[in-house]
Amino acid sequence: MKLTCVLIVAVLILTACQVIAADGWFGEESSCWWCTGQNKCCEEAQVCQSVNYACPPARR
């Protein structure tokens, strides 16, 4: 019974990791989902930074 529970939990964790990675939660698609307050999103450079500074050049 314990082995079954461990396997179920492992499958759920792996599935959650795949969903997170596929949805771009780590910034692959957009790095600005967490950019708030006195910050602005610089999509080309994939950074979030202060509104007081210009966006850096785009990443290659």
Swiss-Prot record:
Subcellular location: Secreted
GO CC terms: extracellular region
Cysteines joined through disulfide linkages: 32-42, 35-48, 41-55
Signal peptide: 1-22
UniProt KW Cell membrane keyword: no
Keyword Zinc: no
Keywords: Disulfide bond, Knottin, Neurotoxin, Secreted, Signal, Toxin
Molecular function via GO: toxin activity
Tissue expression: Expressed by the venom duct.
Comment, domains: The cysteine framework is VI/VII (C-C-CC-C-C). The presence of a 'disulfide through disulfide knot' structurally defines this protein as a knottin.
Family: Belongs to the conotoxin O1 superfamily.
Protein name: Conotoxin Cal6.20
